[in-house]
Swiss-Prot record:
Basic and acidic residues bias: start-end ranges: 14-23, 485-498
TM spans (from-to): none
The UniProt record lists the keyword Coiled coil: yes
Ranges annotated as biased composition (Basic residues): 522-534
Membrane topology term: Peripheral membrane protein
Subunit field text: Interacts with DLG1. Interacts with ARF6 (GTP-bound form).
Organism whose genome encodes this protein: Mus musculus
Biased composition (Polar residues): 369-383, 538-549
Coiled coil regions in record: 42-171
Name of protein: Tight junction-associated protein 1
Protein backbone atom coordinates (compact mmCIF):
# COMPACT_ATOMS: atom_id res chain seq x y z
CA UNK A 1 0.00 0.00 0.00
CA UNK A 2 2.90 2.16 0.75
CA UNK A 3 4.27 1.65 -2.78
CA UNK A 4 1.21 3.15 -4.48
CA UNK A 5 1.69 6.63 -3.02
CA UNK A 6 4.65 7.79 -5.12
CA UNK A 7 2.77 7.02 -8.36
CA UNK A 8 0.63 10.11 -7.95
CA UNK A 9 3.48 12.46 -8.79
CA UNK A 10 5.17 11.31 -12.01
CA UNK A 11 8.44 12.83 -13.13
CA UNK A 12 7.18 14.13 -16.43
CA UNK A 13 3.66 14.75 -17.26
CA UNK A 14 2.63 12.79 -20.28
CA UNK A 15 0.51 14.28 -22.99
CA UNK A 16 -3.19 14.07 -22.52
CA UNK A 17 -3.70 11.27 -25.07
CA UNK A 18 -1.14 9.08 -23.39
CA UNK A 19 -2.15 9.74 -19.92
CA UNK A 20 -3.73 7.05 -18.03
CA UNK A 21 -7.03 7.83 -16.55
CA UNK A 22 -6.57 6.90 -12.98
CA UNK A 23 -9.54 7.30 -10.91
CA UNK A 24 -8.81 8.52 -7.58
CA UNK A 25 -10.07 6.15 -5.09
CA UNK A 26 -11.45 7.90 -2.31
CA UNK A 27 -10.13 7.16 1.08
CA UNK A 28 -13.27 5.57 2.05
CA UNK A 29 -13.06 3.20 -0.95
CA UNK A 30 -9.49 2.25 -0.18
CA UNK A 31 -10.47 1.54 3.17
CA UNK A 32 -13.25 -0.50 1.65
CA UNK A 33 -10.88 -2.41 -0.69
CA UNK A 34 -8.76 -3.39 2.09
CA UNK A 35 -11.66 -4.85 3.38
CA UNK A 36 -12.60 -6.54 0.00
CA UNK A 37 -11.73 -9.95 -0.96
CA UNK A 38 -9.59 -11.29 -3.74
CA UNK A 39 -12.54 -12.15 -5.90
CA UNK A 40 -13.66 -8.74 -5.98
CA UNK A 41 -10.23 -7.66 -6.79
CA UNK A 42 -10.06 -9.92 -9.88
CA UNK A 43 -13.28 -8.48 -11.27
CA UNK A 44 -12.02 -5.03 -10.90
CA UNK A 45 -8.82 -5.82 -12.76
CA UNK A 46 -10.67 -7.50 -15.60
CA UNK A 47 -12.79 -4.42 -16.06
CA UNK A 48 -9.72 -2.34 -16.18
CA UNK A 49 -8.13 -4.61 -18.86
CA UNK A 50 -11.18 -4.39 -21.05
CA UNK A 51 -11.13 -0.66 -20.82
CA UNK A 52 -7.48 -0.69 -21.74
CA UNK A 53 -8.14 -3.00 -24.67
CA UNK A 54 -10.87 -0.66 -25.92
CA UNK A 55 -8.51 2.20 -25.64
CA UNK A 56 -5.82 0.29 -27.53
CA UNK A 57 -8.23 -0.65 -30.30
CA UNK A 58 -9.30 2.97 -30.73
CA UNK A 59 -5.65 4.02 -30.79
CA UNK A 60 -4.91 1.38 -33.42
CA UNK A 61 -7.84 2.52 -35.52
CA UNK A 62 -6.63 6.02 -35.26
CA UNK A 63 -3.09 4.98 -36.28
CA UNK A 64 -4.39 3.12 -39.33
CA UNK A 65 -6.46 6.11 -40.35
CA UNK A 66 -3.39 8.26 -40.03
CA UNK A 67 -1.39 5.78 -42.10
CA UNK A 68 -4.04 5.81 -44.82
CA UNK A 69 -4.08 9.58 -44.82
CA UNK A 70 -0.30 9.57 -44.98
CA UNK A 71 -0.29 7.24 -47.96
CA UNK A 72 -2.90 9.32 -49.75
CA UNK A 73 -0.89 12.48 -49.09
CA UNK A 74 2.26 10.77 -50.28
CA UNK A 75 0.63 9.82 -53.59
CA UNK A 76 -0.59 13.39 -54.05
CA UNK A 77 2.82 14.71 -53.31
CA UNK A 78 4.36 12.30 -55.81
CA UNK A 79 1.90 13.48 -58.47
CA UNK A 80 2.64 17.07 -57.70
CA UNK A 81 6.35 16.32 -57.79
CA UNK A 82 6.02 14.76 -61.25
CA UNK A 83 4.06 17.69 -62.50
CA UNK A 84 6.60 20.08 -61.09
CA UNK A 85 9.40 18.09 -62.73
CA UNK A 86 7.62 18.25 -66.08
CA UNK A 87 7.12 21.96 -65.65
CA UNK A 88 10.75 22.29 -64.73
CA UNK A 89 11.76 20.52 -67.93
CA UNK A 90 9.51 22.80 -69.90
CA UNK A 91 10.96 25.83 -68.23
CA UNK A 92 14.46 24.53 -68.93
CA UNK A 93 13.59 24.12 -72.63
CA UNK A 94 12.10 27.58 -72.73
CA UNK A 95 15.15 29.00 -71.06
CA UNK A 96 17.39 27.24 -73.56
CA UNK A 97 15.38 28.62 -76.48
CA UNK A 98 15.35 32.08 -74.96
CA UNK A 99 19.08 31.90 -74.45
CA UNK A 100 19.59 30.90 -78.09
CA UNK A 101 17.30 33.67 -79.32
CA UNK A 102 19.04 36.14 -77.08
CA UNK A 103 22.40 35.12 -78.49
CA UNK A 104 21.08 35.44 -82.05
CA UNK A 105 19.48 38.79 -81.30
CA UNK A 106 22.69 39.95 -79.70
CA UNK A 107 24.63 39.04 -82.83
CA UNK A 108 21.98 40.78 -84.96
CA UNK A 109 22.15 43.83 -82.76
CA UNK A 110 25.89 43.92 -83.13
CA UNK A 111 25.60 43.76 -86.90
CA UNK A 112 22.93 46.45 -86.84
CA UNK A 113 25.11 48.60 -84.65
CA UNK A 114 27.96 48.24 -87.13
CA UNK A 115 25.61 49.18 -89.95
CA UNK A 116 24.32 52.14 -87.95
CA UNK A 117 27.85 53.32 -87.35
CA UNK A 118 28.58 53.06 -91.07
CA UNK A 119 25.33 54.88 -91.90
CA UNK A 120 26.16 57.52 -89.32
CA UNK A 121 29.53 58.15 -90.93
CA UNK A 122 27.88 58.26 -94.36
CA UNK A 123 25.16 60.55 -93.04
CA UNK A 124 27.81 62.88 -91.65
CA UNK A 125 29.51 63.00 -95.03
CA UNK A 126 26.11 63.47 -96.72
CA UNK A 127 25.17 66.24 -94.34
CA UNK A 128 28.49 67.96 -95.03
CA UNK A 129 27.98 67.55 -98.77
CA UNK A 130 24.40 68.86 -98.48
CA UNK A 131 25.57 71.86 -96.48
CA UNK A 132 28.29 72.51 -99.02
CA UNK A 133 25.77 72.20 -101.85
CA UNK A 134 23.44 74.61 -100.07
CA UNK A 135 26.27 77.08 -99.60
CA UNK A 136 27.20 76.70 -103.27
CA UNK A 137 23.56 77.18 -104.23
CA UNK A 138 23.30 80.31 -102.09
CA UNK A 139 26.55 81.59 -103.58
CA UNK A 140 25.26 80.86 -107.08
CA UNK A 141 21.98 82.60 -106.24
CA UNK A 142 23.89 85.66 -105.06
CA UNK A 143 26.06 85.59 -108.16
CA UNK A 144 22.97 85.18 -110.34
CA UNK A 145 21.34 88.15 -108.64
CA UNK A 146 24.50 90.24 -109.05
CA UNK A 147 24.92 89.19 -112.67
CA UNK A 148 21.23 89.88 -113.30
CA UNK A 149 21.61 93.36 -111.84
CA UNK A 150 24.75 93.91 -113.89
CA UNK A 151 22.95 92.58 -116.97
CA UNK A 152 20.04 94.94 -116.36
CA UNK A 153 22.44 97.83 -115.85
CA UNK A 154 24.32 96.86 -118.99
CA UNK A 155 21.06 96.53 -120.91
CA UNK A 156 19.92 99.95 -119.72
CA UNK A 157 23.33 101.37 -120.60
CA UNK A 158 23.17 99.73 -124.03
CA UNK A 159 19.69 101.14 -124.61
CA UNK A 160 20.81 104.61 -123.54
CA UNK A 161 23.93 104.36 -125.70
CA UNK A 162 21.85 103.16 -128.65
CA UNK A 163 19.49 106.09 -128.20
CA UNK A 164 22.42 108.49 -127.90
CA UNK A 165 24.11 106.87 -130.89
CA UNK A 166 20.94 107.21 -132.94
CA UNK A 167 20.51 110.83 -131.89
CA UNK A 168 24.17 111.58 -132.59
CA UNK A 169 23.92 109.84 -135.95
CA UNK A 170 20.87 111.86 -136.93
CA UNK A 171 22.49 115.03 -135.57
CA UNK A 172 25.66 114.30 -137.51
CA UNK A 173 23.71 113.69 -140.71
CA UNK A 174 21.83 116.95 -140.20
CA UNK A 175 25.04 118.70 -139.25
CA UNK A 176 26.69 117.53 -142.45
CA UNK A 177 23.77 118.81 -144.49
CA UNK A 178 23.77 122.12 -142.63
CA UNK A 179 27.55 122.49 -142.71
CA UNK A 180 27.56 122.05 -146.45
CA UNK A 181 25.02 124.87 -146.63
CA UNK A 182 26.41 127.20 -143.94
CA UNK A 183 29.24 129.60 -144.61
CA UNK A 184 32.30 130.21 -142.48
CA UNK A 185 33.11 133.89 -141.81
CA UNK A 186 36.19 133.39 -139.70
CA UNK A 187 39.10 132.34 -141.90
CA UNK A 188 40.39 132.13 -145.43
CA UNK A 189 41.76 128.86 -146.68
CA UNK A 190 44.91 128.26 -148.61
CA UNK A 191 44.80 125.96 -151.55
CA UNK A 192 47.22 123.51 -149.92
CA UNK A 193 45.00 123.23 -146.82
CA UNK A 194 41.91 122.20 -148.77
CA UNK A 195 41.08 118.53 -149.44
CA UNK A 196 42.29 117.07 -152.71
CA UNK A 197 38.86 116.84 -154.29
CA UNK A 198 38.01 120.40 -153.31
CA UNK A 199 41.32 121.59 -154.83
CA UNK A 200 40.43 119.81 -158.07
CA UNK A 201 36.96 121.34 -158.02
CA UNK A 202 38.31 124.85 -157.45
CA UNK A 203 40.83 124.39 -160.27
CA UNK A 204 38.18 123.07 -162.64
CA UNK A 205 35.79 125.91 -161.89
CA UNK A 206 38.50 128.53 -162.32
CA UNK A 207 39.73 126.80 -165.46
CA UNK A 208 36.19 126.66 -166.86
CA UNK A 209 35.71 130.36 -166.08
CA UNK A 210 38.98 131.18 -167.82
CA UNK A 211 38.03 129.07 -170.84
CA UNK A 212 34.73 130.92 -171.15
CA UNK A 213 36.48 134.29 -170.88
CA UNK A 214 39.47 133.47 -173.13
CA UNK A 215 39.50 130.23 -175.18
CA UNK A 216 43.32 130.19 -175.32
CA UNK A 217 44.76 128.89 -172.02
CA UNK A 218 47.27 131.18 -170.39
CA UNK A 219 50.38 129.75 -168.68
CA UNK A 220 49.91 132.08 -165.71
CA UNK A 221 46.61 130.44 -164.76
CA UNK A 222 48.29 127.64 -162.77
CA UNK A 223 47.69 127.87 -159.02
CA UNK A 224 50.40 127.72 -156.39
CA UNK A 225 49.91 125.83 -153.09
CA UNK A 226 50.19 129.05 -151.08
CA UNK A 227 47.39 130.78 -152.99
CA UNK A 228 44.61 131.96 -150.69
CA UNK A 229 41.18 130.81 -151.82
CA UNK A 230 38.45 133.21 -150.63
CA UNK A 231 35.56 131.77 -148.73
CA UNK A 232 33.13 133.06 -151.34
CA UNK A 233 34.80 130.92 -153.99
CA UNK A 234 34.49 127.81 -151.83
CA UNK A 235 30.91 128.74 -151.01
CA UNK A 236 30.07 129.14 -154.70
CA UNK A 237 31.70 125.79 -155.42
CA UNK A 238 29.85 123.99 -152.64
CA UNK A 239 26.52 125.81 -152.98
CA UNK A 240 23.57 123.53 -153.55
CA UNK A 241 21.25 124.32 -156.48
CA UNK A 242 18.19 122.72 -154.86
CA UNK A 243 16.56 122.98 -151.45
CA UNK A 244 17.20 120.48 -148.66
CA UNK A 245 14.01 118.44 -149.03
CA UNK A 246 13.83 114.72 -148.47
CA UNK A 247 10.46 114.24 -150.23
CA UNK A 248 11.26 116.04 -153.47
CA UNK A 249 10.34 114.23 -156.66
CA UNK A 250 13.58 115.20 -158.44
CA UNK A 251 16.39 112.69 -158.39
CA UNK A 252 19.73 112.65 -160.13
CA UNK A 253 21.68 109.84 -161.68
CA UNK A 254 22.52 106.83 -159.55
CA UNK A 255 25.83 107.61 -157.94
CA UNK A 256 28.17 105.98 -155.53
CA UNK A 257 27.08 105.33 -151.93
CA UNK A 258 27.97 107.77 -149.20
CA UNK A 259 31.34 107.50 -147.56
CA UNK A 260 30.12 107.56 -143.95
CA UNK A 261 27.40 108.93 -141.73
CA UNK A 262 29.59 111.50 -140.02
CA UNK A 263 30.83 113.29 -143.11
CA UNK A 264 29.93 113.13 -146.77
CA UNK A 265 32.58 114.25 -149.19
CA UNK A 266 31.75 115.77 -152.54
CA UNK A 267 32.53 114.41 -155.98
CA UNK A 268 34.98 116.82 -157.56
CA UNK A 269 35.68 114.89 -160.76
CA UNK A 270 32.71 116.02 -162.80
CA UNK A 271 34.75 117.99 -165.32
CA UNK A 272 36.25 117.02 -168.61
CA UNK A 273 37.75 113.50 -168.37
CA UNK A 274 40.18 114.26 -171.18
CA UNK A 275 41.83 117.15 -169.35
CA UNK A 276 45.59 116.71 -168.93
CA UNK A 277 46.81 115.67 -165.49
CA UNK A 278 48.36 118.27 -163.27
CA UNK A 279 52.13 118.30 -162.94
CA UNK A 280 54.00 117.31 -159.81
CA UNK A 281 52.16 118.89 -156.91
CA UNK A 282 54.10 120.89 -154.36
CA UNK A 283 53.96 120.52 -150.61
CA UNK A 284 50.36 120.35 -149.36
CA UNK A 285 48.84 120.15 -152.85
CA UNK A 286 46.96 117.04 -153.90
CA UNK A 287 47.25 115.45 -157.31
CA UNK A 288 44.33 114.56 -159.54
CA UNK A 289 42.90 111.08 -159.27
CA UNK A 290 42.66 110.33 -162.99
CA UNK A 291 45.85 109.91 -165.02
CA UNK A 292 46.52 109.60 -168.69
CA UNK A 293 47.72 106.02 -168.44
CA UNK A 294 45.03 104.80 -166.10
CA UNK A 295 42.32 102.28 -166.68
CA UNK A 296 39.12 103.19 -168.57
CA UNK A 297 37.17 103.04 -165.35
CA UNK A 298 39.45 105.66 -163.76
CA UNK A 299 39.29 107.89 -166.83
CA UNK A 300 35.49 108.04 -166.84
CA UNK A 301 33.98 111.03 -165.04
CA UNK A 302 32.73 110.05 -161.62
CA UNK A 303 29.04 110.83 -161.01
CA UNK A 304 28.03 113.27 -158.32
CA UNK A 305 27.53 111.90 -154.85
CA UNK A 306 24.02 111.12 -153.71
CA UNK A 307 22.14 113.57 -151.54
CA UNK A 308 22.44 112.70 -147.89
CA UNK A 309 19.52 110.53 -146.78
CA UNK A 310 18.40 110.03 -143.17
CA UNK A 311 19.58 106.41 -143.34
CA UNK A 312 22.69 106.30 -145.54
CA UNK A 313 24.45 103.10 -146.51
CA UNK A 314 27.37 102.52 -144.12
CA UNK A 315 30.77 102.12 -145.70
CA UNK A 316 34.40 102.46 -144.59
CA UNK A 317 35.35 106.07 -143.79
CA UNK A 318 37.20 108.11 -146.33
CA UNK A 319 40.87 108.76 -145.42
CA UNK A 320 40.64 112.42 -146.46
CA UNK A 321 37.42 113.15 -144.51
CA UNK A 322 37.65 112.02 -140.89
CA UNK A 323 34.90 112.82 -138.41
CA UNK A 324 34.34 116.22 -136.82
CA UNK A 325 34.85 116.94 -133.15
CA UNK A 326 32.68 120.00 -132.49
CA UNK A 327 29.64 121.12 -134.48
CA UNK A 328 28.12 124.56 -133.90
CA UNK A 329 25.20 126.29 -135.54
CA UNK A 330 24.38 129.96 -135.94
CA UNK A 331 21.08 131.23 -134.57
CA UNK A 332 20.57 134.33 -136.73
CA UNK A 333 17.77 132.87 -138.83
CA UNK A 334 16.72 129.95 -136.66
CA UNK A 335 13.08 129.84 -135.68
CA UNK A 336 10.91 126.99 -134.41
CA UNK A 337 7.53 126.67 -136.19
CA UNK A 338 4.43 126.97 -134.09
CA UNK A 339 2.74 123.79 -135.34
CA UNK A 340 5.90 121.69 -135.31
CA UNK A 341 5.25 117.91 -135.57
CA UNK A 342 8.60 117.19 -133.89
CA UNK A 343 8.39 118.49 -130.29
CA UNK A 344 10.81 115.84 -128.99
CA UNK A 345 13.47 116.03 -131.67
CA UNK A 346 17.00 117.20 -131.07
CA UNK A 347 18.30 120.73 -131.32
CA UNK A 348 20.01 120.06 -134.64
CA UNK A 349 16.79 118.61 -136.10
CA UNK A 350 14.77 121.67 -135.06
CA UNK A 351 17.46 123.92 -136.49
CA UNK A 352 17.40 122.05 -139.77
CA UNK A 353 13.59 122.25 -140.00
CA UNK A 354 13.51 125.95 -139.14
CA UNK A 355 16.38 126.79 -141.47
CA UNK A 356 14.79 124.83 -144.30
CA UNK A 357 11.46 126.61 -143.74
CA UNK A 358 13.13 130.04 -143.72
CA UNK A 359 15.21 129.37 -146.80
CA UNK A 360 12.31 127.68 -148.59
CA UNK A 361 10.15 130.77 -148.04
CA UNK A 362 12.87 133.12 -149.29
CA UNK A 363 13.46 130.79 -152.23
CA UNK A 364 9.80 130.86 -153.28
CA UNK A 365 9.59 134.64 -152.90
CA UNK A 366 12.68 135.12 -155.02
CA UNK A 367 11.47 132.66 -157.67
CA UNK A 368 8.17 134.48 -157.98
CA UNK A 369 9.94 137.87 -158.47
CA UNK A 370 12.75 136.84 -160.85
CA UNK A 371 11.99 135.38 -164.29
CA UNK A 372 13.67 132.25 -165.57
CA UNK A 373 16.83 132.36 -167.64
CA UNK A 374 18.02 129.92 -170.29
CA UNK A 375 21.45 129.64 -168.65
CA UNK A 376 20.04 128.03 -165.54
CA UNK A 377 17.99 125.54 -167.53
CA UNK A 378 21.08 124.34 -169.34
CA UNK A 379 23.39 124.36 -166.29
CA UNK A 380 22.66 120.96 -164.77
CA UNK A 381 22.96 117.90 -167.00
CA UNK A 382 21.47 115.68 -164.30
CA UNK A 383 18.10 117.44 -163.92
CA UNK A 384 15.41 118.03 -166.54
CA UNK A 385 14.31 121.64 -167.09
CA UNK A 386 11.02 122.30 -165.36
CA UNK A 387 8.41 124.80 -166.64
CA UNK A 388 8.15 128.16 -164.87
CA UNK A 389 5.44 128.13 -162.16
CA UNK A 390 2.53 130.47 -162.63
CA UNK A 391 1.91 133.37 -160.29
CA UNK A 392 -1.58 132.08 -159.39
CA UNK A 393 -0.35 128.78 -157.92
CA UNK A 394 2.35 130.38 -155.72
CA UNK A 395 0.34 130.62 -152.43
CA UNK A 396 -1.04 127.09 -152.70
CA UNK A 397 2.35 125.62 -153.55
CA UNK A 398 4.01 127.45 -150.64
CA UNK A 399 1.52 126.04 -148.13
CA UNK A 400 1.73 122.52 -149.56
CA UNK A 401 5.54 122.57 -149.70
CA UNK A 402 5.74 123.62 -146.04
CA UNK A 403 3.40 120.78 -145.06
CA UNK A 404 5.38 118.34 -147.21
CA UNK A 405 8.60 119.51 -145.56
CA UNK A 406 7.25 118.95 -142.05
CA UNK A 407 5.79 115.58 -143.06
CA UNK A 408 9.09 114.50 -144.59
CA UNK A 409 11.05 115.42 -141.44
CA UNK A 410 8.46 113.60 -139.31
CA UNK A 411 8.73 110.46 -141.46
CA UNK A 412 12.52 110.58 -141.42
CA UNK A 413 13.26 111.36 -137.76
CA UNK A 414 10.13 110.42 -135.75
CA UNK A 415 8.57 107.46 -137.57
CA UNK A 416 12.02 106.38 -138.86
CA UNK A 417 10.60 105.38 -142.21
CA UNK A 418 13.32 104.52 -144.75
CA UNK A 419 13.45 106.99 -147.64
CA UNK A 420 12.44 105.91 -151.15
CA UNK A 421 14.98 104.79 -153.70
CA UNK A 422 14.67 108.05 -155.62
CA UNK A 423 15.66 110.03 -152.54
CA UNK A 424 18.55 107.70 -151.75
CA UNK A 425 19.96 108.09 -155.27
CA UNK A 426 19.56 111.88 -155.32
CA UNK A 427 22.75 113.80 -156.08
CA UNK A 428 24.10 116.21 -153.54
CA UNK A 429 25.28 118.97 -155.86
CA UNK A 430 24.03 119.98 -159.25
CA UNK A 431 26.03 121.74 -161.92
CA UNK A 432 23.65 124.50 -162.87
CA UNK A 433 25.93 127.02 -161.15
CA UNK A 434 28.77 126.53 -163.65
CA UNK A 435 27.76 129.30 -166.12
CA UNK A 436 27.38 131.85 -163.34
CA UNK A 437 30.68 130.85 -161.74
CA UNK A 438 32.35 131.07 -165.13
CA UNK A 439 31.18 134.66 -165.43
CA UNK A 440 32.21 135.43 -161.85
CA UNK A 441 35.67 133.89 -162.02
CA UNK A 442 36.78 135.00 -165.43
CA UNK A 443 40.46 135.95 -165.91
CA UNK A 444 39.46 139.61 -166.11
CA UNK A 445 38.00 139.53 -162.65
CA UNK A 446 40.78 137.44 -161.14
CA UNK A 447 43.67 139.55 -162.48
CA UNK A 448 42.14 143.02 -162.15
CA UNK A 449 43.48 145.06 -159.25
CA UNK A 450 40.92 145.08 -156.41
CA UNK A 451 39.75 148.64 -155.78
CA UNK A 452 37.85 147.74 -152.59
CA UNK A 453 37.62 144.89 -150.01
CA UNK A 454 34.43 143.69 -151.73
CA UNK A 455 36.34 142.32 -154.71
CA UNK A 456 37.70 139.13 -153.21
CA UNK A 457 35.78 136.81 -155.49
CA UNK A 458 38.76 136.14 -157.74
CA UNK A 459 41.69 133.97 -156.67
CA UNK A 460 44.55 136.27 -155.63
CA UNK A 461 48.05 134.85 -155.86
CA UNK A 462 50.66 136.04 -153.36
CA UNK A 463 53.69 137.87 -154.74
CA UNK A 464 56.21 135.95 -152.65
CA UNK A 465 54.84 132.68 -151.28
CA UNK A 466 58.09 131.81 -149.50
CA UNK A 467 58.63 135.19 -147.88
CA UNK A 468 58.71 135.55 -144.12
CA UNK A 469 55.64 137.77 -143.77
CA UNK A 470 53.12 136.57 -141.17
CA UNK A 471 49.70 135.40 -142.21
CA UNK A 472 47.92 138.61 -141.19
CA UNK A 473 50.24 140.79 -143.30
CA UNK A 474 49.88 138.39 -146.19
CA UNK A 475 46.09 138.59 -146.02
CA UNK A 476 46.29 142.37 -145.87
CA UNK A 477 48.52 142.35 -148.94
CA UNK A 478 46.05 140.05 -150.70
CA UNK A 479 43.24 142.48 -149.81
CA UNK A 480 40.98 139.84 -148.22
CA UNK A 481 37.89 140.58 -146.11
CA UNK A 482 38.64 141.34 -142.51
CA UNK A 483 35.19 140.97 -140.91
CA UNK A 484 32.17 138.72 -141.62
CA UNK A 485 30.11 141.81 -142.53
CA UNK A 486 32.46 142.65 -145.41
CA UNK A 487 32.30 139.10 -146.69
CA UNK A 488 28.50 139.12 -146.41
CA UNK A 489 28.35 142.41 -148.31
CA UNK A 490 30.63 140.95 -150.94
CA UNK A 491 28.47 137.86 -151.34
CA UNK A 492 25.06 139.56 -151.26
CA UNK A 493 24.50 142.24 -153.96
CA UNK A 494 22.71 145.44 -153.06
CA UNK A 495 18.96 145.74 -153.26
CA UNK A 496 19.23 148.18 -156.10
CA UNK A 497 20.99 145.60 -158.23
CA UNK A 498 18.52 142.82 -157.48
CA UNK A 499 15.47 144.89 -158.31
CA UNK A 500 16.63 145.37 -161.90
CA UNK A 501 15.21 142.51 -163.95
CA UNK A 502 17.32 143.00 -167.10
CA UNK A 503 21.04 143.46 -167.24
CA UNK A 504 23.71 143.05 -164.53
CA UNK A 505 23.91 145.37 -161.53
CA UNK A 506 27.01 147.45 -160.74
CA UNK A 507 28.31 147.52 -157.16
CA UNK A 508 31.59 149.33 -156.48
CA UNK A 509 32.41 149.45 -160.13
CA UNK A 510 31.94 145.74 -160.80
CA UNK A 511 29.27 143.98 -162.84
CA UNK A 512 27.29 141.37 -160.91
CA UNK A 513 25.21 139.05 -163.09
CA UNK A 514 21.69 138.35 -161.90
CA UNK A 515 21.26 134.82 -160.50
CA UNK A 516 18.93 132.49 -162.33
CA UNK A 517 15.50 131.55 -160.89
CA UNK A 518 16.41 127.85 -160.80
CA UNK A 519 19.28 128.78 -158.47
CA UNK A 520 18.02 131.69 -156.33
CA UNK A 521 20.07 133.93 -154.09
CA UNK A 522 20.99 132.04 -150.92
CA UNK A 523 21.71 133.25 -147.45
CA UNK A 524 25.35 133.16 -146.35
CA UNK A 525 24.28 130.71 -143.65
CA UNK A 526 23.45 128.12 -146.31
CA UNK A 527 26.92 128.22 -147.84
CA UNK A 528 29.46 126.66 -145.54
CA UNK A 529 32.90 125.22 -145.37
CA UNK A 530 32.85 124.42 -141.66
CA UNK A 531 34.07 120.95 -142.43
CA UNK A 532 37.17 122.19 -144.30
CA UNK A 533 39.69 122.33 -141.48
CA UNK A 534 43.37 121.68 -141.66
CA UNK A 535 44.41 118.14 -142.34
CA UNK A 536 46.86 118.07 -139.45
CA UNK A 537 44.20 118.90 -136.85
CA UNK A 538 41.77 116.38 -138.33
CA UNK A 539 44.40 113.66 -138.38
CA UNK A 540 45.41 114.46 -134.82
CA UNK A 541 41.78 114.36 -133.64
CA UNK A 542 41.24 111.05 -135.42
CA UNK A 543 44.36 109.52 -133.87
CA UNK A 544 43.47 110.74 -130.39
CA UNK A 545 39.94 109.35 -130.68
CA UNK A 546 38.26 112.67 -129.90
CA UNK A 547 36.22 112.82 -133.07
CA UNK A 548 32.55 113.48 -132.27
CA UNK A 549 33.16 113.05 -128.53
Amino acid sequence: MSSAAPAKKPYRKAPPEHRELRLEIPVSRLEQEESLTDAERMKLLQQENEELRKRLASATRRTEALERELEIGQDCLELELGQSREELDKFKDKFRRLQNSYTASQRTNQELEDKLHALASLSHSWIFAIKKAEMDRKTLDWEIVELTNKLLDARNTINKLEELNERYRLDCNLAVQLLKCNKSHFRNHKLADLPCELQDMVRKHLRSGQEVASPSPSPSSSLSPGAVVPTSVIARVLEKPESLLLNSAQSGSAGRPLAEDVFVHVDMSGGDPASPPAPGSPNGECCSVSTAGGSPEEELPLPAFDKLSPYPTPSPPHPLYPGRKVIEFSEDKIRIPRNSPLPNCTYATRQAISLSLVEDGSERAHRSSVPSSPASAQGSPHHQPSPAPSALSAPASSASSEEDLLASWQRAFVDRTPPPAAVVQRTAFGRDSLPELQLHFSPGHSTAPPPSPHRERGLVLPAEPDSGFPQDEEEEMLNLPVSPEEERQSLLPDKEGTEEASGPSHVDGRAWPLPSPSRPQRSPKRMGVHHLHRKDSLTQAQEQGTVLS
